[in-house]
UniProtKB/Swiss-Prot annotation:
Pfam family, one: p450
Gene3D superfamilies to which the protein is assigned, alphabetical: Cytochrome P450
Taxonomy of the source species: Eukaryota, Viridiplantae, Streptophyta, Embryophyta, Tracheophyta
GO MF, one annotated term: oxidoreductase activity, acting on paired donors, with incorporation or reduction of molecular oxygen
Protein name per UniProt: Cytochrome P450 71D2
Listed GO CC annotations: membrane
Classification via InterPro entries: CYP450_71D, Cyt_P450, Cyt_P450_CS, Cyt_P450_E_grp-I, Cyt_P450_sf
Annotated source species: Catharanthus roseus (Madagascar periwinkle)
Amino acid sequence: MDFEYLPFNLVTFFIFLFFVFLLIYGRRKSKRTXKINLPPGPWKLPILGNLHNMMMGSSPHHIFRDLSRKYGDLMLIKLGEFNTIVASSPRMAKEVLKTHDLSFLNRPIIQATKILCYDNSALVFSQYGDSWRQMRKIFVLELLSTKRVRSFQPIRQDEGSRLVSLIKESVGKSIDLSEKIKLYTTSMVARAAFGKVNDAGVTFLKLVTEAAEVAEGFDPADMFPSYKFLNVFFNSRSNLLKIHGKTDMILEEMIDEHIKSHQMGKKANGENGEEDVIDILLSIKDSGDLGISHWMNNVKALIFDMFSAGTETSSATVEWAMTELMKNPSVMRKAQDEVRQAFKGKKTIDESDLEELKYLKLVVKEVLRLHPFAPLLVPRECREACQIDGYDIPVKTRVFVNVWAIGRDEKYWKDPESFIPERFEDNSLDFTGNNFEYLPFGCGRRICPGMTFGLANVHLVLALLLYHFNWKLPPGVNDIDMAERPGLGASKKHGLVLVPSFYQPSF
């Protein structure tokens, strides 16, 4: 069993067990609770609940899928002190995300997001209420609206050209394509947010990646919040505070730099004279429309949101797309033929022409069916008690929707484990959350606000990689590694190493 990515190894786990049992049985008296009708689920250990199930060596979405086959599409598990339900079918997803959406609009309070996201003031992890509504309005209408995403097109084109040039330097050699893709996304997001790529921005992105890796695990301090000593024992809080201190300093400097620039009359700080995210937020503040208190922390939290969501998700999707295309050469040929036919005679791809690439978009849809970046979506928490299928769901119950399992369920998908983009031809399935068998970005009020921004990056980068290069496996490698990185995400465990050869289009 590989414990590399678990929050504790076997030795510390058993020490942890000893202290928890000692404290629980030494300090707590048994409490009588009214009997309620909870969903079915696997048997639970005293105190620990179903944590033993999470030690099975697989990622949570795999474990939950396997358990739900036995206990049903609405399953109850207990992770430490918290009851958690897992919805694993389109019908149950609809119950949680639409029928009872107002009951499940809150997020669980975990210390990683509380520390890193300025007391959960970022949009993704903030609690439902007036502040969240105002933040969402700013994010959706100002920062990442369709019009605003289009305004970032010159940045995407510029960084896309740099990506192509970078890969051309290594033609005929084995390269870690994953690293090249991440370089594009980090540079793109840095320029969109800060106006430029500099050492501070690169450092910030590394810290965001480090923070994401910490947050992806199950932290014992979050599962047993009553026992503060766990923060000392596992040192997680200390590590998070160190990361936050560094990211906060960088954001403070970037915002101060923009404030001074605005005071001097320069309202757009992008490399090509365009407004960046900080410029936009400062303009909203100056107009008096921000409508939120502690605006500096909210601005920082919004930027942190954008970086954490915009870099990892886009790069992971392109990585999986190239992985699946290498594993399915007939699909690769069809996608490349479409791109090269559509742009025949052009030295490079202009983003405005991507609408012609119908098959490429089917490929991306199929990638997100098999490899949604958030396979359990972002967890929710019940804020108003409700009933689903006759089962009682108490307040504070945590909720996962296993969209990864739903996307691979043979009840709803023919040959679900195969990569077949054509399955999306001539049907109404899209990313907007109206079809509950396909929810890579969630749905409703809590749908991913950066969906349009992320897809714009994915479509352009994938088109560039297919147009300008042919790809093969390195010498001695006969198969593609499909392993996922353990945790709450579903990115590739190992980088995608390929050998590019430059394709010279005929003019």
